[in-house]
């Protein structure tokens, strides 16, 4: 299993995001409970988010992320997936 850093950029309004946020967070919570997601949260400007995942490969992770309610609703304008090698901290 590899660790991946995922960055989202949103194209939805704050109101649109707020309306769908409970479903988005329920989806994230299920991934946390399964051990697929390690951490997530909004970026400082609230125009996107950073998510940390464990996955076999980028293809598997991309397919998983396609199920995000924010993505299904078309709220994500950009999604960047990068393999990450955490040397220090809780994710190594």
Residue ranges and their predicted role:
Residues 1-92:
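Conserved, structured core segments of small domains
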